[in-house]
Amino acid sequence: MNKKYKPVIAVAVLVILVAILGIVTHVVMKYIPSSEKMDLNEYYGEMADGEIALVIGTEKMEERGLVDGDRVYLPLDVVNTYLNQRYYWDSANQQILYATPSELTSASASSEAGDKVWVKDDKVYLNLTYVQEFTDLDAYITKDPYRIAIQYKFKNVKTVTVKKNTSIRYRGGIKSAILTSVKKGTKLRLIEEMENWDQVATDDGYIGYIDKKKVGEAEKTKFERSFKREQYSYLTMDSKVNMVWHQVTSTDANAYFADATANMTGVNVISPTWFYLTDTSGNIASIASADYVSQAHEKGLQVWGLIDNFTQEVSTTETLSSTAARQNIISQLIQAAQDVGMDGINVDFESLSEDVGTHFLEFLRELSIECHKNNLVLSVDNPVPEDFTSHYDRAEQGRVVDYVIIMGYDEHYVGSEAGSVASLPWLSLIHISEPTRPRLISY
């Protein structure tokens, strides 16, 4: 071979080798998973001294908890939203109230850590152990950085099971940083299924992505639990409730009971309009009548005395947001029921604004305790379920009262366009929306 071509060939071979090496390197690098570990301080975010990151279920929270020694405190709003809505903040008395089926418990707030309730910078926090008294949850506390993961859903949970040891990554793809390693047999909570990667959450607070080939098929899982939930018992009638309201506007009007019911058939409950709020201290007016109750019982009718909030000058929000006022209403209602022999109480608080929702529910919980102590049926009147009345929280009502009543006759009214009073499509909203069907009364 001509000597003058040898250097050229050598250079060409070298270029080819470099190109091949580059291609091989590119291919290898493309398909070799990254071993880079995610910076957990970056993942959970910055925290001030004394703060702890929160992962609630499959959601990494922006809000922080507090930690003091081995005590962890959770923000009340997080507890109410995700874990247990029955912790009620009584701001006037600086205490948390918790209504069980049989008693109203309280825990005073402190400006220092150590007790069940800690108020810091005007924000209310609950000790984790206090939350666990009444709430079914699993808590996983980890350091570096300080974080707590809480699992609270244990029925019909979508899960996948790890088939072989692998990693959960920050994003979908083998080049994404590793959050944590998981072993074969680990059950992960499935957030979203994708083509090649699934978004999953570990019980101890990592939310990321796993190679779909490394997990089994999605399934519904029920986790075994030993926590004993508080159980409400209900005072219900053996037969279907057929109730009428009886508008009674004065003490003298009670005398017209016989005339009002003379031709009435098929009814087993009558609810006279006997009580209403008179001021924001919780005082009520009463025109209840023992003679009326006696006549009703002779006709085979139960009497559920009705209390309303129709007095324009009395703020329902101001009244129900006061623990003293709520207790005042309740004590007067119970006393009146005992005095005249009523069988139950019907609450007809209407046009409730969103800001009174929490206080209204607390009122029902507290009233339920006293009603059941005195063998009184508790029922509550509600508008047909719609988005703008969601704060009535009929599901929670159904857990604590005996009967949830839906006023289905308000589809059209004075001032609205003409139409049916209670059409079938309108009434169907009731049955689709309400979980308390055996104790649901609709009109």
Name what the model sees in each region:
Residues G185, D198-T202, I210:
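SH3/SH3-like beta-barrel fold
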Residues R169-Y170, Q199, S250-Y256, T278-S281:
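Short, solvent-exposed loop/turn elements at domain surfaces
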Residues D238-V248, M264, Y276-L424:
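Chitinase-like catalytic core of GlcNAc-active glycosidases
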